C-alpha cells in the first residue's frame, strides 16, 4: 500500500449560499473550469438522494451541487444546501474545519485586487513572506460568501520541501 503514497488530493467541497453566483465567481475570478453546474439531489429520490442522506445524515433534505476544476486537476465541489438552508459561516478559525483554499498566483496584488473587485474582501493588509527571509509570498482574502482564500507565489512543494525543519524550527 505504501507504494501508492502520497495520496493525491482529488477535490475540496465548499458550501455557499448561492450556487449559481459562486460558480460564476470561481470561474470568472479564479479561472476554474466548470465541469457541471446545479445538479439537484433530494433525500429519498434515487441513488444520489440515498447516498446524500447517508453522507449528510438526519435533517438532510435537498442540495444543489456543481463541480469545477483547478489548473492542476484538483476539483472544487460547491454545495448550496436548500433544505436545510445554508447558514452564515462562523468567522473564527480555531474550530475544526477547513480553514482556507490556496491558489497559485505569481502576482499576489493582481489576484487579491481581482477578488476585491468581484465582491470579495482583503484579509491581510499586504503580502507576507511564507518563511521569513525567503522569496515565497502569500496573501489572504475572502470570497463574497466569507470563504477564506489564500494566494501563494510558488507551489507548496517549492516552498516547503527543502526547509529541513518543522514549523517550530525543529530538525
Regions from the language model: what does each represent?
Residues 27, 114, 153:
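Short amphipathic alpha-helical segments
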Residues 15-73, 117, 134, 166-169:
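Core segments of cupin and vicinal oxygen chelate
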Residues 1-5, 163-171:
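Basic/polar N-terminal segments that are highly enriched at the extreme N-terminus
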Residues 6-7, 17-21, 36-42, 70-148:
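Vicinal oxygen chelate
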Residues 13, 152-158:
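Short beta->alpha transition motifs characteristic of CBS
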Residues 85-88, 156-160:
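A short local loop/turn or secondary-structure capping micro-motif enriched for an aromatic residue
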Amino acid at each position: 500500500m505504501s507504494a501508492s503514497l502520497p495520496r493525491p488530493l482529488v477535490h475540496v467541497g465548499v458550501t455557499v449560499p448561492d450556487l449559481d453566483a459562486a460558480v460564476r465567481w470561481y470561474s470568472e475570478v479564479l479561472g476554474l473550469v466548470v465541469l457541471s453546474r446545479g445538479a439537484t439531489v433530494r433525500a429519498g429520490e434515487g441513488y444520489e438522494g440515498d447516498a446524500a442522506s447517508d453522507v449528510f445524515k438526519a435533517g438532510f433534505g435537498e442540495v444543489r451541487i456543481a463541480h469545477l476544476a483547478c489548473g492542476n486537476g484538483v476539483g472544487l465541489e460547491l454545495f448550496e444546501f436548500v433544505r436545510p438552508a445554508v447558514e452564515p459561516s462562523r468567522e473564527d478559525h480555531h474550530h475544526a474545519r477547513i480553514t482556507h483554499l490556496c491558489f497559485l498566483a505569481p502576482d499576489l496584488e493582481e489576484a487579491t485586487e481581482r477578488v476585491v473587485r468581484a465582491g470579495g474582501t482583503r484579509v491581510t493588509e499586504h503580502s507576507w513572506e511564507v518563511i521569513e527571509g525567503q522569496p515565497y509570498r502569500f496573501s489572504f482574502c475572502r470570497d463574497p460568501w466569507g470563504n477564506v482564500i489564500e494566494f501563494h507565489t510558488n507551489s507548496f512543494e517549492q516552498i516547503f520541501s527543502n526547509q529541513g525543519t518543522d514549523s517550530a524550527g525543529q530538525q
